[in-house]
Amino acid sequence: MTATAPVTAATAPTPEATLAPAAPVATTLPLSPPANLRDLGGIAIAGGSTRAEFAWRADDLSVIDDASATRLMSAGLSTVIDLRSIAETEITGRGLLGAYPVAYHHVPFMASISSAVDHVADPSEMWDQSRFAQMYISLFENAAPQIVTAMAVIAHAPGAAVFHCAAGQDRTGVLAAALLLAVGADSDAIVTDYAETGHNIAAVSVR
């Protein structure tokens, strides 16, 4: 594991740091496993688009195979941000990427998966998609320090960064939304990126 210097929100980059002339970019990397990994490059923002390979979002990277890990490294990966709880990381670990020279940052957005249930009146409602918006708002509020930390890590990464949770949908989706909002993406672009997970979630679920 490569050590990294402490980072703070105060030194986060301006939106211009990720601007590039708009150009078609394939936003989904053909890597499996994981099943929900994609580049956040090529997303329209004011003045251009996000730079390809500055950040990826993903589902559980502990399942990555050697060929996929090698390809990520070849694409400039320098930093992994793990949003899972301590219990989740103890079950599956870091996977093969743990053997590569990348900085690893564990920034758990929840103390445990069960803590997500604590913020809804009826735990069964947690899986009601009509209530996802409220769940994400609660996650923004309760994990605000972690969101700031993760964004600062991405800003100061010497190469590309990838952040992930277990399915790459909720915690990862919240961080992706915060990141895209910070660099100037509009709500439609953020929702479009989030919706891409819908095409991949079945493969994540069967795994």
Question: What residue spans do the PLM features occupy?
Answer:
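Cys-dependent protein tyrosine phosphatase-like superfamily
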Residues: 1-161, 175-207
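Short beta-strand segments
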Residues: 164
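Ser/Thr-glycine-rich phosphate-binding loops at phosphate-binding pockets of nucleotides
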Residues: 167-172
